[in-house]
């Protein structure tokens, strides 16, 4: 497939703000692909393969600027200045290509496969001379591409394609292009257990729907973890759960999948990125702890004080993420315990459709607790007083609260789903919301007075998981230290968009738009009806949405979450209804 066809389609996608039109363009593009369909899918995602393979070009913006300088005889400083103004290195590459006089003497045919192969060479290049090899590979693409093509190729390399599509949009288009839409839910479930859109598209194109429907948990392939709904009281949870359920500590750590197969261990984050090399102590301990042929375990990695055993908050674990050196030293200074609470696969058996209580018994039977692996603390109860005591113990032990889990016969493990089989109960913030919110930054407003020179407020949005859009819910200007406040322009410069991104639904016009990328944790006073914001628009009142009143940044950037993992508009709507219900009860 010629990349010129892809670039033309990308240009049309980038210019539309209509979701249905965007999906139709994507469907038509997928249908034009041949055997290179999986490669096209990966490029659409701004990747070279599924996340769990961890393939990256190692081509930074700085290196691209260096290559563009070589190609154009324009200084790196000058290109960097233009990049700072534009906020998109792809646009800069296009502008330089339009002015170039040099082209490759032997023109390569720019196909999807050729581009993917070239980017894979970048990714696999190591050792001395690897930087030059990557620059040379980029130069090859630059000299053989049209200006439009190099713009999109450069964006693919940086992982910021800027055409307003997500995995959900791509999956929807794959189903429309290659399958009967009656299988849509089943295909989504398969993707949640096997998050490789390239593979799924390829099999569906061949007509292998049965192979896709059989997909389930597989050792060494991470899945999208199960998530919890939220309620604000023990009594509400027990009522929702039929009077009795299990309650587990909700640990403040990093969600971690532990995969074991024939003595080999791999760890994955909730974003399906491999973290094995960052936690060699946990990897080694897993090999020694679990005497099984194969298993997939779900848990929370939590840092702790080696002297007192006290649990540290989530932020401390960031000192270990991404490190390549001194890991042994850091491992001893900041040891990790993985608190396990579920098992979805054991010795060739898929346990995802086994009830929760049986899964828990199986989990308890396969290992002896140690400093590295422990069971999440748990009780089963229908007594509110007992649960309240357990909740207080969780807070005292440094946890966020509790997760209630259904013990019904159909309490299956539902990958990627947020449902009422699991319900979280976090610390009561008194007059504030009873839980924090994870919101995506979609815009910013310039600061004035003391905040001149930085952003005075950020525009935050919830995720509408039905429409695959981001809906504004508040302007945030509180909770920032001066250091964080004045670092905001630098933090967000790579996400700047010249116009409102297609997936953002907003009535407000900020000074700067951002592509949805950064998630931050926020607390607020209450949820209110808003004629300005678009979250859950029209659900409570016509021509009005919902907003967070008096939002405040908690100080926690949710780097472990993708924008699509943000608090959903539906959750905000449920919180508003619960809030109204509580106020009514208090008045009566």
UniProtKB/Swiss-Prot annotation:
Please list the GO biological process terms of this entry: cell division; DNA biosynthetic process; DNA recombination; DNA repair; lagging strand elongation
Q: What is its EC number?
A: 6.5.1.1
- The protein, known as: DNA ligase
Q: Specify the superkingdom.
A: Archaea
- Role this protein plays: DNA ligase that seals nicks in double-stranded DNA during DNA replication, DNA recombination and DNA repair.
What is the similarity comment for this entry?
Belongs to the ATP-dependent DNA ligase family.
Show the stretches that span the lipid bilayer.
none
Q: State the top-level EC class.
A: ligase
List the molecular function annotations (GO) for this entry: ATP binding; DNA binding; DNA ligase (ATP) activity; metal ion binding
Gene this chain is encoded by:
lig
The active-site annotation reads 250
Catalysed reaction, written as an equation: ATP + (deoxyribonucleotide)n-3'-hydroxyl + 5'-phospho-(deoxyribonucleotide)m = (deoxyribonucleotide)n+m + AMP + diphosphate
Q: Which species is the source of this protein?
A: Thermoplasma acidophilum (strain ATCC 25905 / DSM 1728 / JCM 9062 / NBRC 15155 / AMRC-C165)
Cofactor needs: Mg(2+)
Say yes or no: keyword DNA damage present: yes
PANTHER family, sorted: DNA LIGASE 1, DNA LIGASE 1/3 FAMILY MEMBER
Write out the residues that bind ATP: 248, 255, 270, 300, 341, 418, 424
- Write out the entry's keywords from A to Z: ATP-binding, Cell cycle, Cell division, DNA damage, DNA recombination, DNA repair, DNA replication, Ligase, Magnesium, Metal-binding, Nucleotide-binding
Name of a matching Pfam family: DNA_ligase_A_C
